[in-house]
Curated annotation (Swiss-Prot):
Source organism phylogeny: Eukaryota, Viridiplantae, Chlorophyta, core chlorophytes, Chlorophyceae
Assembly mode: Heterotrimeric complex composed of SEC61-alpha, SEC61-beta and SEC61-gamma. Interacts with ARSA2.
Name the record gives this protein: Protein transport protein Sec61 subunit beta
Transmembrane parts of this sequence: 66-86
Gene from which this protein is expressed: SEC61B
Keyword Transport: yes
Length: 89
């Protein structure tokens, strides 16, 4: 028993390797990501299509999200006021 390690004293790393094969320091804590193709931002065709949909020059009113939310809340408040006024008449 002096030359061999017991089961309790052997540390097993996250990947299932014993502590004698496990990398030490920061290399042991971080795993490398697989290498992707040649450069680029990594956007897919679906993401590019979505960006084109939102950035294309389309006919219609151009409104920011803040304007849309403000108008929606105003409409909800107006309908609520109409219900309250209609209840008391």
């Amino acid at each position: 028993m002096a030359g061999s390690q017991s089961q309790a004293s052997t540390l097993v790393a996250r990947g299932g390797r014993s502590s004698s094969n496990a990398p030490t320091g920061a290399a042991g804590a971080l795993r490398r990501r697989p290498v992707r193709g040649s450069g680029g931002s990594g956007t897919t065709k679906a993401q590019q299509a979505a960006m084109n949909f939102y950035t294309d020059d389309t006919p219609g009113w151009k409104m920011s999200p803040v304007v849309v939310i403000t108008m929606s809340l105003s409409f909800i408040a107006f309908v609520t006021i109409l219900h309250v006024v209609g209840k008391f008449q």
